[in-house]
Design a protein with these regions (language model features):
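C-terminal, flexible cofactor-proximal segment of oxidoreductases
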Residues: 1-38
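Helix-biased detector of long, well-ordered alpha-helical tracts
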Residues: 37-265
């Protein structure tokens, strides 16, 4: 048997089967009895911890810790609190530097590397600067030597590709083994004039979004098993898109730009 009607019949059978897997009864966690340490109940009842910006330490906790940092050196124009730190160079130009890392959201090292690299570069682009170099910080789960080598090769190849497309170069990094895959990058950039900072925003400025917001909501739903696959695929594709062209267009006319992550929208 063959023909389009057969394929439609098969598609109907397959979809009926998959729909049965999408409508499962909700599991109820057993009650924990006996004496418990303080905070155990809250931890057991908590939602899964996001691997992205939702995993960031709270603003209040972070601000409290940063107040204990010593005053910056003379060459430090801006430190903690902006997308990237700004350093004044001896020739009158400026260098920006930022670091970011993400715990793996998906079981795809290549795509996760692309997302993490674009995520880190976003801080440099938000300052209106040109990316310069990048250092990778990678935590890989325990696995065989062959699988480790293959995973690290895949990660470095994609990182080199993304950084090169941005006009930057991967110049080194650090690797360790840990509980789960974590990929991060420290990136530097340069700018002839003072980089854009969030403090440059003025009353009456028009707010321009260069990509959709709400990725955290979809990823949180995915962690709970409630997100549609096409929505997750769309989010991952958007997260892997570089924003260099948008930044190049807006930087000459914008009062301020920021990479909308963490404490953003």
């Amino acid at each position: 048997l063959k023909g389009p009607l057969i394929w439609r019949w098969k598609d109907w059978i397959d979809r009926a089967f998959i729909n049965r897997l999408n409508d499962l009864p909700k599991m109820v966690a057993p009650k924990v009895t006996g004496e418990l340490a303080t905070g155990v109940a809250e931890i057991l009842a908590a939602k899964p911890l996001c691997g992205g910006c939702g995993a960031k330490v709270g603003r209040g906790v972070l601000s409290s810790a940063l107040t204990k940092i010593a005053p910056p050196f003379d060459e430090v124009v801006t430190g903690a609190g902006d997308d990237a730190a700004v350093l004044r160079q001896s020739n009158g130009t400026f260098q920006v530097i930022s670091t970011d890392h993400l715990r793996s959201l998906i079981d795809d090292p290549a795509l996760m590397t692309r997302i993490a690299a674009v995520h880190a570069l976003g801080d440099v682009w938000a300052m209106g600067a040109q990316p310069q170099v990048g250092l990778a910080s990678i935590v890989v789960p325990q696995m065989s030597a062959d699988l480790q080598a293959r995973t690290l090769t895949e990660i470095t190849q994609v990182a080199t590709e993304v950084l090169s497309a941005a006009g930057a170069q991967l110049v080194g990094g650090h690797t360790t083994m840990g509980a789960e895959l974590t990929i991060g990058f420290t990136v530097t950039g340069r700018k002839d004039t003072m980089p854009l900072t969030v403090s440059g925003a003025q009353p009456g400025d028009v707010l321009i979004l260069t990509r959709p917001i709400g990725s955290g909501v979809i990823l949180a739903a995915d962690m709970e098993g409630h997100a549609h696959g096409r929505f997750v695929a769309s989010v991952l594709a958007i997260m892997g898109q570089a924003q260099d062209r948008e930044a190049a267009v807006l930087a000459p006319v914008a009062h301020a730009m920021t990479d909308v992550t963490g404490f953003g929208l």
